[in-house]
Amino acid sequence: MVSNKLEQTFKFANDKNIERAERVLMQALVQDAVGVDLILTKLEPKDFFGFPFNFIFQTAQENYSEGNKLFGSALLEAVKFKLDTDSKTQREIEGLFEDVLLKGLPFLERDIKVFVDVVKKASIFRQLKQFAKKVEKEEFKVKDDRFEGYLQAIQNDFTKIIHSAFVSIPGLSYDEIVREEEELIPKVYRGELTVKGLKSGFYPLDQLTSGWKEGELIVVAARPGRGKTALLINFLQGAVNDSEKFDKNKDVLLFFSLEMRNREIYQRHLMLESQVNYTLTSRQRLANVYDDLIKASEVLRDLPIKIFDYSTITLDEIRAQITEVSKTNNVKLVVIDYLQLVNAFKNSYNISRQQEVTMISKSLKSFAKEFNVPIIAAAQLSRRIEERKDSRPILSDLRESGSIEQDADMVLFIHRVKDEDSENQEAIGHNNIFQVELILEKNRSGPTGKVQFDFQSDVSTFRVREYNPDGYS
């Protein structure tokens, strides 16, 4: 029989989910059920509330790390051996195995991950409570000359707790990777898969980038007033039109607008869809295009795009929003307009803005990998580049903005042809069409190059003129 001492293990919490979770995981471990590898790699002995579960788990994990997966009677004997000569405790462990772990509660394979998460979360909360008690207890005991060292020590302790909450991603063997690549290579050979990621809506650009790929950070940089927001909206349109990779019934695009209200973003998208700038159109002419506007509005109504407009937003808030939407939808693309308006923290700290922007770009890259989604972030360039003889943007123009240049997988610059050019000046005066170059200055996984566009600013529309792959003059 199981002793009263061991029964306390099952009654340690009011939350019956935690109690059941620990039991189920122990059962899976002892019975070598499907999912044991996840249990042994994600959890630690301290994640279980107390003896004997933590002791059983430690024994199993030590043998697992040495290449021996023990279960059933073999695991029981290993546990008893570690207990040495404590015969009373050995008998209690035997009773636990016989009465609970080798019989006990039924469970399904899909339950394992859920119960692992329950146990891990409960463990983190226990550790945080213990950490808080420790800090409170030491409040008046730390001497002034040791305060900085004390702060460093508690920061390290806190960081260890937080880091233990994250699951390590299992590595893939070459065999597993090759299986995926073997399916792709014939398609590439036949020309069926020139674009691996989500389409931008511009064929020449997709030929350079292979599309917006999962886990990548793409930065679109330009001086103020060069059409960054308009281009991002064009990218949204291109993504939702990608019928091969975007399912309007399941997928969603997220747009974080820090400069414009959500209504302004919608208006620009409506102008793009309808090709009508209704805010500047006379009432008489508007009557002629009214049906086009209504039709375009109906198209946009059904698009799975969520716009978050903030005057300021922190990294934690961006992550929280992506997490929340991911619970019910498949997030295919995240767009941020623009990067330098994001705050790393809710409160200001004693760090430079350059350091903060570095934290932001590194975190956005981390989010892209964590959520397995491409993130496109606009970035603003200083007007000082106009002082150069050749005002075409280059990568070093981003260096004053932290480590954007290093963190981004792709960097695209919007460069408007010199306004003093007579042809372009005439266009500016007549129909708001500007000649611009979209320069792919950095591409970690492919060629660089440029695509020439006509940018019709009054209806937020980019149209391809021509493109030049593999470099430019």
Swiss-Prot record:
- Could you say which residues bind ATP here? 222-229
What is one GO biological process annotated to this record? DNA replication, synthesis of primer
- Write down the InterPro entries for this protein, in alphabetical order: DNA_helicase_DnaB-like_C (IPR007694), DNA_helicase_N/primase_C (IPR016136), P-loop_NTPase (IPR027417)
Which catalysed reactions does the entry list for this protein? Answer: Couples ATP hydrolysis with the unwinding of duplex DNA at the replication fork by translocating in the 5'-3' direction. This creates two antiparallel DNA single strands (ssDNA). The leading ssDNA polymer is the template for DNA polymerase III holoenzyme which synthesizes a continuous strand; ATP + H2O = ADP + phosphate + H(+)
Which parts of the chain are coiled coil? none
GO MF annotation, one: DNA helicase activity
Any one GO CC term of the record: primosome complex
The keyword Flavoprotein appears for this protein = no
SF4 helicase domain segment(s)? 191-469
- Reported EC number(s) for this entry are 5.6.2.3
Q: Which SUPFAM superfamilies match?
A: P-loop containing nucleoside triphosphate hydrolases
Has UniProt tagged this entry with the keyword Ribosomal protein?
no
Q: At the top level of its lineage, which domain of life is listed?
A: Bacteria
Which UniProt keywords are listed? ATP-binding, DNA replication, DNA-binding, Helicase, Hydrolase, Isomerase, Nucleotide-binding, Primosome
Family that this chain belongs to:
Belongs to the helicase family. DnaB subfamily.
What biological function has been recorded for the protein in this entry?
The main replicative DNA helicase, it participates in initiation and elongation during chromosome replication. Travels ahead of the DNA replisome, separating dsDNA into templates for DNA synthesis. A processive ATP-dependent 5'-3' DNA helicase it has DNA-dependent ATPase activity.
Q: How does it assemble?
A: Homohexamer.
Protein name, please? Replicative DNA helicase DnaB
Q: Which organism is it from?
A: Mycoplasma pneumoniae (strain ATCC 29342 / M129 / Subtype 1)
